[in-house]
């Protein structure tokens, strides 16, 4: 049990750290509207997408799994959502600060959970059943990390 607790504490720290690193990396890009090589989006679009997926997908799934009995989630089409909701005029700094604040609030929720809260179950229309709250936290971290690496590559050109 000690190792599991340590893993979860580390997971929360990594989630906060990667969110802050993502913000810093995005803000260090000279022109966030320049298309990225090999990518369909620019840094501003990636930042908006990452913030929206935190709020509408992984963050929401963590919250609902913590509060509801075995909630069911449907798939999220990030491309379609961006096509309909993307605002290129949205301040990059403001949206990234909003993103980091959202992650910090999520971590506060996680810190307040009893150990068994991390094992609460949920379902997904295509992924099936038995998905724990911890699974959604891990997927959130992986999603942010993936986009952080993309932005880092753009910065290291």
Question: How would you describe each model-predicted region?
Answer:
Residues 1-10, 56-99, 157:
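Short, helix-capping/interhelical loops that line the mouth of catalytic, cofactor-
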Residues 3-31, 53-64, 139-142:
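Alpha-helical bundle segments that constitute or directly flank the non-heme di-iron/ferroxidase center
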Residues 5-16, 40, 44, 89-96, ...:
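Amphipathic, non-membrane alpha-helical segments in soluble helical-bundle scaffolds
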Residues 8, 19-24, 35-39, 79-84, ...:
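Short amphipathic alpha-helical segments, especially helix-boundary/capping motifs
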Residues 12, 107-110, 138, 145:
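Generic N-terminal initiation segments characterized by hydrophobic and/or small/turn-forming residues
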Residues 14, 18, 23-27, 81-119:
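Acidic/histidine-rich alpha-helical segments that form the ligand environment
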Residues 32-78, 122-157:
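Short, contiguous alpha-helical
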């Amino acid at each position: 049990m000690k190792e599991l607790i340590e893993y979860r504490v580390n997971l929360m720290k990594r989630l906060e750290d990667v969110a802050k690193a993502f913000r810093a990396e995005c803000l260090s890009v000279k022109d966030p509207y320049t298309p990225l090589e090999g990518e369909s989006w620019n840094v501003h679009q990636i930042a908006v997408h990452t913030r929206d997926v935190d709020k509408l997908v992984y963050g929401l799934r963590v919250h609902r799994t913590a509060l509801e009995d075995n909630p069911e989630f449907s798939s999220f089409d990030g491309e379609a959502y961006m096509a309909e909701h993307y605002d290129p005029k949205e301040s990059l700094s403001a949206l990234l600060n909003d993103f980091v604040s959202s992650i910090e609030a999520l971590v506060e929720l996680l810190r307040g959970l009893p150990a068994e809260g991390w094992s609460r179950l949920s379902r997904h229309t295509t992924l099936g059943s038995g998905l724990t709250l911890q699974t959604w936290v891990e997927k959130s971290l992986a999603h942010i990390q993936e986009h952080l690496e993309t932005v880092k590559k753009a910065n290291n050109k």
